[in-house]
Structures are given as structure tokens and as C-alpha cells.
């Protein structure tokens, strides 16, 4: 017999425009969270978009600004029920804590009946669910016949992308079935060969009428666990937020700054899941905001759009950029914000065709020296046999998205990547940008080929070894607003006005080549390198002053330093720091050294490339500063806590090792991880610290145990014993 609460819940299924009352939401959430206090974070989960009238968050956590983001959500859908998790690891129930209990509750809630029959697909957890007295089987095929054997199915959604499978699941749920699914949405592009989650995932799309969906966003970076709470903000549901915003605009209750921030965030997350042909949510947002009028504001560095003062404008612009990113290939109009950034193509700039040599053994972005003007349709042609093999055309190098930031100095998402599914592809960008051919990692065995790009604007592109300084004096006159300079180890992207000030591109790119080669060499990664590093200047980046990755992102204010040989030679610290991040590996980087070992690698550039004192790069490593770090450690009651929380204090430890034992000791340490004589690589932070001590002690033929103790670096007694017969070493002043 169904409970009274269940009957109320079912009664709401047929109501199209009424939200579930908060008391009912809390009652249903309480069932799912019964006996659950917390859930460990599994992997790197992403947020769930929530907008349905019968949808609600199950588990969430606040971001740095206190805005709640859901990692799991539930919804009623016709006669059935759906639960989604932002990572597939949650489906197996094996993360510890109250995880198993949570999944037991999820099955019971989704089944809405006693002793449900449970089917698992892509989830290795038969024994766990049997322990909870469910009748459990695995199944392989998603179709009407297979699904009919179960009351609830738990499905790893990562690879379930066909529309037919999605339709089968949707019909199953509408008929009364329970569906529990999860996937790593932000990784879908990688696992699917470059496809877009909102467009290409048939199952995620099929469940959208329930009003919840997996998104391609990431979140929860610093989180360790999710606390179970029966009461969560109503405004986590985008429909609730849209309704509240509309009521405020119509003279109803005013929203607090916190409510507006929560609501706009919920709408942005929900919009991230929407394919371009699904207009319900978009229409509701536009209705709530009213006509654009004065709201049509273009963000700039001088006049940014802030969360506190420009919530409505940010909602509108954020929605526009999400829709434009997924819009059909042709017929995309230029967005007004493109003129502020990345910039307008000069009037009268010629449109040309270019033949681009593509080397499939070099994955990532292949520069073309061409630019797509905002709103222009470009055509890309590649050999027929390579169509639909994972190659793509990218428009724009400014790949950071800014939706999560409280301040926007440009539109939050301005690049596009479109798969080359056919031999001829037409596409356009509302913002414009440099054009690239994207090469998938799996294409390494393909033969080199030529791609043709038509209706593009010539852009300055200098290639070391192919162009010389005299040729550059002509190349830099090309009209596109963005330019690139390249060598086989690194490519820089900067405003053309900055590039035109360069008169010695050969010297500049030879220098950059040496920087990357030096870091490759000291870290034993020369043979690993498959593609050049990239550094892109942007008016606003997603995190920090600069950040690592592909590409490394820097502010446009740093572009002149990046492209001026004299400035780069000193100080250059930030660039070497970020390239160093890209060279970090887990074997030698443990808790507290994420911002340290990259600096060790970066400092090596001063010695090997600049041929200067390698301690001149930063004021926090001068002799006086290092003395202060040492004194602080001496006085600390908890040396380890100080050491691991202050990067330049920790860096002083490494500096002492280099000063005494030379850079060759660091080289041997990093190379030792490929030397079987040193044993297997570490698998945990405890092992990494132990092996740091043991390997370095053996390399230097000194017992570094007392040195580690002086700095407060915890190592095991076994590790200390292993090096105890060596002569101890301690630097002066310690």
C-alpha cells in the first residue's frame, strides 16, 4: 500500500506548472537520506542540473561563495522515478561511510515498492546490493524486453548514448520503472571522441522531461564529503528560481543577494544541460527577465558584469553563450560582445582559403594561421577517409569558461569545437577566433594529410625554422586580431597588436624552445612529449593570475612580457611556474607540494637556460627570505602543518638540497622512478614522502633523515632505518 506522502507525490506528477511544496520535497528527501549522515566524494564529480516541477536535490555542497550545488538529484517522471549522480563511482555503493545505506535507500525510493527486482548495467556491485536483500541481476542490452525484468535499474550512463536506448529507458520510467544513473559529465567529451554531452548523449536527453540532467560542468574540487541535509534551498531548482525572479520583476517579494546568487547559479547549471533544440527553459528565463532593453550589456574589463549588481544581465548573457556554443553550424550571427573580446576583424579584411598540413602524431590543436570572423561561416574540408574519426575544427583559443566567477570581464564562453563528421563541414562562431584543426589522441597512426579551410581571415603565425625575422615583418601585417608564434615545444597566442611589436621572433621562440626542453630534460619527460605546450593570453581567465593546463592561460597584461625576449629573461617566474605545473607528476608531488615541485622545475630554467643565479626569480626565495622561512619552522609547534601550507617555506627545503648536492641530484631523483633498482613507484602520499627520503639519501650518499625531521616532513621509521647507515647531513643554520 502506498503511503500518504507517496500519493501526494503522484498527484503532483500531472501538474505542469506547480512546484512541489517545500514540505513534500523535504519529506521525500528524508526518505532517501534516512540513516545517512555523509557521503564521501568519489572521483571528480560534477553538478546535476535541476529544473523540473517534480525534481529536487538529494545531496549538495556549498561552493566558496556559499552557493549550494547538487551532486545528486531525484525526480518523478510520469509513473516512475529517476535519481542521477554526478559521478558513476557512486552507483556501486562502495565509497565507504554511509554510501551503501544511501544506495539502499535510493533503490527503495526509485522502486516505490517492497522487495524490488534490481538490474545493474556497467556497475560491479551485485554482492553489495544482495547484502541488502535485493534480488539482483546484471543485464547487457537496454531495450524494452530487458528493462521489463526489473523494478529498478542502476546504469553507468557514460557510454549509453544512442537515442534508441534513451527512448527505451524513458518509456520504462514513464510506465512506472525506477532509474538510477550516474556518469562523469565533464569527461564525456574525452570518452566519446569529442562529442558534446548536451547534444550527443541519447539517454541524458531522453530523461530531460523529468527535469534533471547530467551536465558537463565540474565542481567540488576542495570537497572531501557531502553532508546529508533534509533541508536545502528551494532555489537550487531552476524553475523555482525563474518563478521567484519573475515575481520580483512583477513587483513581488524582493530577493536577497544570497537568493539571487543561488537562483542564478541553479539556472546556469540547468542551462548547461540543455541541447539547442530544447527551448522550454530558455523561454521561461526570457519571460522572467522580460525584454532585453537596458539589460543588453556587454562586459568589459573596465565595466564587468558582477553577480551582485547584474544578475539579470548575467543570466541572459550566460544563456546566450550556452545556446550559441551548441548552435547549428551555419547561420550564427555575430554577438555584440565579440567586439569587446576577442575583438572585431578590421573592415575590408580579405577572406581567403588555406591548405593546412596536419600531422596526426601531434595531438591537440593544429594552428592554421587563419581566423574566423564573428558570424562568418567557414568551411573545413578533409579527406573522406578521416571524416567522423574524431577530428574537429576549433574556433577560438580562449577556452576558459567563466560562468562560476562573480565577475565577468568578457562573455563567459566564447569558443566552439565542432566535430568533422563529414568530409566537408560548415560552421560559424558568434565571437570569432583563431581556427585550429583538433587532432584526437587516438589518431597517432594516421598518415599526415592536408585540410582546407575556406572563408577565413589571414592571421599572423610565425613558425620557428619555417619563417625568419624578415618574413615576419610581412606576416605580422595580416589583419586578424589574434596572432601566434610557434616552435615545436611551445606556441604562444596573443593580440596581434602585441605581436606586431616583436622584431626578433626567431630569438624569442628559440628561447621558449630551450625553456621547455630544459624542463623536459630535468624531469625525464623528453620522450613523453607528444605536442607543444601552449600559452594563451586572455582578458580574464577561470582561476588565478595564471593557470596551467592545455593551454596555459595568462592575462593579456602579461602578453608583452611573454613576447619580449629581454623581459622574459628576467623575471619570467610565472611562466616557468605554470610550465612546471605541466611537468609535475604524482611520484614526486605529495600533499603540500602542489605549488612547490613545479617551482623547483621552474627554477631550473634560470640555471640551464638563462645562465643566471637561479635564486633571483622571486622575492620569496632571497637569502633573507629563506632565513625567515627557516626561523619560522624552528619556532613552529607543528612544523609539518606550517611546511605543507606555505609553499615558499617548503621550497626552501628543496633549495637547500640543490645548493648542497647540485641540480644533478634532482635530475637523478626524478629519473630514479624509471630505474628498477630503486623499486616500485609510490602509491600514496606516505610512500611518496618515504621514497623522497630514501631515494634522495641514496643518490646523495647522505642520511637525510635528520634533515627531514628538522623541517617536520613526516616519514616512517622504516624509511629512516633504510638510510641510517649513511652519514647524516644538515645544512648550516638548521
Descriptions of predicted regions:
Residues 13-15:
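N-terminal signal peptide c-region/cleavage motif recognized by signal peptidases
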Residues 19-29, 41-50, 60-71, 79, ...:
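Helical hinge/lid and interdomain linker segments adjacent to catalytic or ligand-binding clefts
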Residues 66-78, 481-484, 696:
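Short, surface-exposed beta-strand/loop micro-motifs that present aromatic residues
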Residues 219-220, 226-336, 481-500, 509-512, ...:
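Activation corresponds to long, low-complexity, non-globular regions
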Residues 239-262, 268, 492, 625-719:
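Active-site-proximal alpha-helical
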Residues 283, 293-344, 349-353, 685-734:
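Beta/coil-rich, acidic/histidine-enriched accessory regions frequently appended to metallopeptidases
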Residues 327-459:
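Beta-strand-enriched, solvent-exposed domains that form extended recognition/catalytic surfaces
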Residues 472-473, 481-659:
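Catalytic cores of extracellular degradative/oxidative enzymes
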Amino acid at each position: 500500500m502506498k503511503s500518504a506522502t507517496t500519493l501526494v507525490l503522484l498527484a503532483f506528477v500531472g501538474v505542469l506548472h506547480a512546484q512541489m511544496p517545500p514540505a513534500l520535497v523535504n519529506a521525500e528527501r528524508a526518505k532517501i537520506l534516512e540513516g545517512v549522515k555523509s557521503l564521501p566524494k568519489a572521483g571528480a564529480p560534477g553538478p546535476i542540473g535541476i529544473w523540473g516541477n517534480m525534481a529536487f536535490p538529494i545531496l549538495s555542497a556549498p561552493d566558496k561563495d556559499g552557493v549550494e550545488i547538487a551532486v545528486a538529484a531525484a525526480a518523478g517522471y510520469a509513473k516512475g522515478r529517476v535519481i542521477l549522480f554526478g559521478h558513476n563511482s557512486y552507483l556501486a555503493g562502495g565509497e565507504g561511510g554511509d554510501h551503501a545505506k544511501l544506495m539502499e535507500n535510493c533503490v527503495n525510493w526509485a522502486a516505490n515498492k517492497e522487495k524490488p527486482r534490481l538490474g545493474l548495467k556497467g556497475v560491479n556491485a551485485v554482492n553489495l546490493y544482495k547484502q541488502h536483500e535485493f534480488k539482483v541481476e546484471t543485464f547487457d542490452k537496454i531495450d524494452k524486453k530487458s528493462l521489463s525484468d526489473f523494478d529498478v535499474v542502476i546504469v553507468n550512463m557514460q557510454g549509453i548514448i544512442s537515442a534508441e536506448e534513451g527512448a527505451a529507458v524513458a518509456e520504462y520510467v514513464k510506465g512506472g520503472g525506477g532509474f538510477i544513473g550516474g556518469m562523469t559529465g565533464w569527461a564525456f567529451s574525452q570518452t566519446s571522441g569529442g562529442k558534446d554531452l548536451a547534444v550527443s548523449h541519447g539517454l541524458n536527453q531522453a530523461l530531460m522531461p523529468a527535469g534533471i540532467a547530467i551536465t558537463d560542468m565540474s565542481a567540488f574540487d576542495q570537497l572531501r564529503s557531502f553532508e546529508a541535509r533534509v533541508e536545502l534551498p528551494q532555489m537550487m531548482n531552476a524553475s523555482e528560481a525563474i518563478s521567484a525572479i519573475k515575481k520580483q520583476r512583477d513587483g513581488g517579494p524582493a530577493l536577497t543577494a544570497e537568493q539571487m546568487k543561488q537562483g542564478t547559479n541553479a539556472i546556469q547549471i540547468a542551462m548547461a544541460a540543455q541541447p539547442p533544440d530544447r527551448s522550454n527553459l530558455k523561454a521561461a528565463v526570457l519571460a522572467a527577465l522580460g525584454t532585453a532593453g537596458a539589460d543588453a550589456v556587454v562586459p568589459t574589463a573596465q565595466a564587468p558584469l558582477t553577480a551582485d549588481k547584474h544578475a539579470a544581465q548575467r543570466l541572459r548573457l550566460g544563456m546566450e553563450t550556452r545556446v550559441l556554443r551548441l548552435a547549428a553550424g551555419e547561420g550564427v550571427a555575430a554577438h555584440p560582445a565579440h567586439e569587446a573580446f576577442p575583438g572585431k576583424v578590421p573592415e575590408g579584411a580579405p577572406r581567403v582559403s588555406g591548405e593546412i598540413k596536419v600531422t596526426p602524431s601531434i595531438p591537440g590543436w593544429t594552428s592554421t594561421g587563419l581566423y574566423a570572423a564573428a558570424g562568418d561561416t567557414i568551411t573545413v574540408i578533409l579527406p573522406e577517409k578521416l571524416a567522423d574519426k574524431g577530428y574537429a575544427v576549433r574556433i577560438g583559443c580562449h577556452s576558459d569558461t567563466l560562468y562560476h566567477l562573480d565577475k565577468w570581464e568578457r562573455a563567459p564562453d566564447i569558443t566552439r569545437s565542432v566535430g568533422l563528421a563529414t568530409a566537408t563541414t560548415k560552421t560559424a562562431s558568434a565571437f570569432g577566433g583563431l581556427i585550429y584543426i583538433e587532432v584526437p589522441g587516438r589518431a597517432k597512426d594516421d598518415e599526415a594529410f592536408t585540410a582546407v579551410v575556406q572563408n577565413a581571415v589571414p592571421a599572423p603565425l610565425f613558425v620557428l625554422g619555417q619563417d625568419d625575422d624578415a618574413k615576419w615583418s610581412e606576416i605580422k601585417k595580416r589583419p586578424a586580431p589574434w596572432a601566434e608564434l610557434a616552435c615545436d615545444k611551445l606556441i604562444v597566442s596573443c593580440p596581434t597588436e602585441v605581436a606586431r611589436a616583436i622584431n626578433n621572433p626567431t630569438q624569442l621562440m628559440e628561447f621558449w624552445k630551450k625553456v621547455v626542453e630544459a624542463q623536459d630534460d630535468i624531469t625525464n619527460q623528453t620522450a613523453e612529449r607528444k605536442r607543444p605546450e601552449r600559452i594563451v593570453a586572455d582578458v580574464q581567465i577561470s582561476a588565478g593570475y595564471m593557470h596551467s593546463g592545455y593551454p596555459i592561460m595568462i592575462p593579456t597584461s602579461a602578453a608583452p612580457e611573454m613576447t619580449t625576449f629581454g623581459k622574459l629573461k628576467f623575471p619570467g617566474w610565472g611562466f616557468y611556474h605554470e610550465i612546471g605545473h605541466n611537468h609535475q607528476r604524482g611520484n614526486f608531488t605529495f600533499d603540500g607540494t602542489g605549488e612547490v615541485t613545479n617551482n623547483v622545475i621552474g627554477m631550473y630554467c634560470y640555471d640551464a637556460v638563462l645562465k643566471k643565479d637561479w635564486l633571483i626569480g622571486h622575492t620569496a626565495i632571497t637569502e633573507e627570505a629563506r632565513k625567515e622561512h627557516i626561523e619560522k619552522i624552528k619556532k613552529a609547534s607543528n612544523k609539518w602543518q606550517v611546511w605543507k601550507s606555505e609553499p615558499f617555506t617548503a621550497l626552501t627545503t628543496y633549495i637547500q638540497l640543490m645548493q648542497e648536492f647540485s641540480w644533478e641530484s634532482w635530475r637523478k631523483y626524478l629519473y630514479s622512478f624509471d630505474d628498477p633498482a630503486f623499486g616500485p613507484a609510490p602509491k600514496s602520499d606516505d610512500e611518496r614522502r618515504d621514497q623522497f627520503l630514501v631515494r634522495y639519501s641514496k643518490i646523495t650518499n647522505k642520511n637525510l633523515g635528520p634533515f627531514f625531521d628538522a623541517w617536520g616532513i613526516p616519514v616512517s621509521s622504516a624509511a629512516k632505518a633504510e638510510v641510517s647507515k649513511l652519514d647524516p647531513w644538515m645544512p648550516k643554520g638548521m
